[in-house]
Amino acid sequence: MKTVELVVPCYNEEEGLAVFIRETTKVTETIEGYSFSFILVNDGSKDGTYTVMKNLAKQYSNVKYISFSRNFGKESAMYAGLKYSTADYVVVMDADLQHPPKMLIDMCKAMEEGYDCCAARRTTREGESKIRSLFSQSFYKISNKISDVQMPYGAV
């Protein structure tokens, strides 16, 4: 059975994190041949995100978490989760369900077809600040320079 870890950067996700885990688990339980787990990365949240993470890790055996002492940014949280992962495959997803969990089904099908890497790409970044877009672009450029796996800008 192949293992997949979902790296989930979290900043002030107290209200929606349990819903994310529940909804994503509904999807992952339908995908045969894969064992899914979660790596939640608390990026210095100021709300109760850390407490929710600890409770989810107690409730679900497939939930692990990392917690930063302060906010370092989404890209740092993503990187920490990727470094911590030991799975066959890793998926980075947002906790706010902007990345539909049902896409995991198609991504696993693509992997079954023999691809080493699979990415979904957001087609628009409307409503995002220019500084946020700049940090996002920088993350992908740096990742592509230091990694053997090339990720297109906006890949999730």
Specify the residue positions occupied by each region the protein language model found:
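N-proximal low-complexity "stem/linker" segments adjacent to membrane-targeting elements
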Residues: 1-26, 33
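Short beta-strand/loop segment that forms part of the nucleotide-sugar
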Residues: 8, 32-44, 66-67
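Acidic helix N-cap motif at the loop->helix transition within catalytic regions
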Residues: 15-19, 47-56
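Short helix-capping segments at alpha-helix termini
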Residues: 28-34, 57-62
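A conserved acidic beta->alpha catalytic loop
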Residues: 42-51, 97-98
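Acceptor/aglycone-binding surface of glycosyltransferases and processive sugar-polymer synthases
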Residues: 62, 68-70, 74-84, 89, ...
